A protein has these predicted regions:
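Immediate post-signal peptide segment of exported/extracytoplasmic ligand-binding proteins
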Residues: 36-65, 141, 146-150, 291-304
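Extracytoplasmic small-molecule ligand-binding "clamshell" domains
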Residues: 38-111
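Periplasmic-binding protein-like
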Residues: 54, 128-136, 210-251, 274-294
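Extended ligand-binding regions for polar small-molecule ligands
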Residues: 71-80, 146-147, 151-152, 159, ...
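A ligand-binding cleft/hinge motif common to bilobed small-molecule-binding domains
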Residues: 94-97, 109-119, 164-167, 193-231, ...
Length: 304
């Protein structure tokens, strides 16, 4: 029996040139990623050591990978920089301290911009924005700072608003917790009257557990007395102060996130599709602190 050998058809010149172009493009992308990784200094070469507290829907480690609204964007940034994500889970206060001490390259998880934080780490461009909301039982209607008078308010130790919350006129007690779970448990048990948690987390919890009969209401702003809690936060990544090249590369990746609407798409996956998440504060507190007077915060108008 005669054996038949399969023979590839010869490529014409155009096909050869196209294949060569594709090969060069792929090689170029790999080289660019490699060059970026080589230029960026990190604690462990070739890896991005990332702090997170595991609060969903913002971030968690699932099957060894980062997931969640912020986590998936962080994974995108690492890939863009040609670095392998090296996530480390810890409580919020430990995240801040570890970044400050240079034990983490970067931290994330609905992290709000705060002027005091600019003194201990480099704060990235925002990935989205949110304001202060009061989480409470459905049968209450707390919506103002006056409503905190004589009442117990719970939040997480290390959150942006803690120093200001303690100054609210007549507030009954500010109860601080190491984790959001602790706050939530006491709110459900009636041991605190209201809670201030990351709005994405609360919105996700409310949608997943309607039987808890919780809601969250925006606080009536009083910017003259309580500027931090009366404005929208820039949600950012916190970067090791000793890694300015990393910060520059991270900001370049975040610029692409806004351009490609990746933050809008990722938030929508977790039920956070309202345009308000992508509208910056009218008066940006970063101006003349870590951004100059010409700074324009990114928006996602082109994504809607």
């Amino acid at each position: 029996m005669k054996k038949h050998r399969l023979q590839a058809k010869p490529l014409n010149l155009r096909s050869r040139l196209s294949a060569l172009a594709l090969g060069l493009a792929a090689a170029g992308m790999l080289a660019a990623a490699g060059a970026m990784a080589a230029e960026v200094k990190t604690i462990e070469p070739g890896k991005l050591t990332i702090g997170l507290n595991g609060d969903m829907p913002m971030t968690q480690i699932k099957d060894g990978q980062l997931s969640g609204t912020d986590g998936e964007l962080m994974a995108y940034v690492a890939k863009k920089l040609g670095l392998e994500p090296n996530p480390k889970q810890m409580d919020w206060a430990a995240e801040i301290e570890s970044t400050k001490q240079g034990k983490l390259d970067i931290m994330h998880g609905a992290m709000g911009w705060l002027e005091s934080r600019t003194k201990i780490m480099i704060l990235s461009e925002p990935i989205y924005y949110f304001g202060t909301l009061l989480a409470q039982k459905q049968d209450t209607n707390y919506h103002s700072f006056a409503d905190m008078k004589g009442r117990k308010v719970g939040t997480v130790n290390g959150f942006t608003l803690v120093p200001e919350l303690k100054t609210v006129d007549g507030i009954g007690e500010v109860k601080l917790y190491d984790t959001s779970d602790g706050v939530m448990q006491d709110l459900l048990a009636g041991r605190i009257d209201m809670a201030i948690l990351d709005p994405p987390l609360m919105q996700y919890a409310i949608s997943q557990h309607p039987e808890w009969k919780l809601k969250q209401i925006p606080v009536d702003p009083e910017p003259a007395k309580y500027p931090v809690m009366s404005t929208k936060y820039n949600v950012i990544f916190g970067i090791n102060k000793n890694e300015p090249e990393l910060a520059e590369a991270v900001n370049a990746a975040i610029k692409d996130i806004w351009k490609e609407c990746l933050n809008v798409k990722t938030m929508a996956k977790y039920g956070l599709s309202d345009k308000a998440w992508f509208i910056p504060p009218e008066k940006n507190p970063r101006i003349e602190v870590d951004r100059d007077a010409t700074y324009k915060a990114p928006t996602a108008d082109h994504c809607f």
